[in-house]
Curated annotation (Swiss-Prot):
Keyword annotations from UniProtKB, A to Z: Ribonucleoprotein, Ribosomal protein
Gene: rplQ
Assembly with partners or alone: Part of the 50S ribosomal subunit. Contacts protein L32.
PROSITE patterns tied to this protein: RIBOSOMAL_L17
One of the GO biological process terms: translation
InterPro entries found in the cross-reference section: Ribosomal_bL17 (IPR000456), Ribosomal_bL17_CS (IPR047859), Ribosomal_bL17_sf (IPR036373)
Pfam families (UniProt xref): Ribosomal_L17
Name by which UniProt lists this protein: Large ribosomal subunit protein bL17
A molecular-function term among this protein's GO annotations: structural constituent of ribosome
Length: 127
């Protein structure tokens, strides 16, 4: 029985799942918006929100915890230098999931995962 076992398996082994969400967390921190399937997006939220909460208090111990979860120095640097200070006043809910239709090949529901309150980049195409 699978009583009280939370989280989606996503038809992957445990190690594959952990590696995938580690990579997705690093990509989201780096780009601040990514496109993925809806179930992966919903599960990613459970991984990235605690990381950002950790980054709100800058300490060596928290940086080491974040590095152990991401294995990326660049991601940890951005988490603690940019994202942590950005979300100090926000008590959670750092991620927005926007549905964006279905994938052409297999009709899988797709979604954008983005960090809320991210700076808007003015496009050069408007000129």
């Amino acid at each position: 029985m699978r009583h009280r076992k939370s989280g989606r398996h996503l038809n992957r082994t445990s190690s594959h799942r952990h590696a995938m969400f580690k990579n997705m967390c690093v990509s989201l921190v780096e780009h601040e918006v990514i496109k993925t399937t809806l179930p992966k997006a919903k599960e990613l939220r459970r991984h990235i929100e605690p990381l950002i909460t950790l980054a709100k208090q800058d300490s060596v111990a928290n940086r080491r915890l974040a590095f152990n979860r991401t294995r990326s120095k660049e991601a940890v640097g951005k988490l603690f230098n940019e994202l942590g200070p950005r979300y100090v006043e926000r008590p959670g809910g750092y991620v927005r999931i926007l549905k964006c239709g279905f994938r052409a090949g297999d009709n899988a529901p797709m979604a954008y995962v983005e960090l809320v309150d991210r700076p808007v980049v003015e496009e050069a195409a408007e000129e």
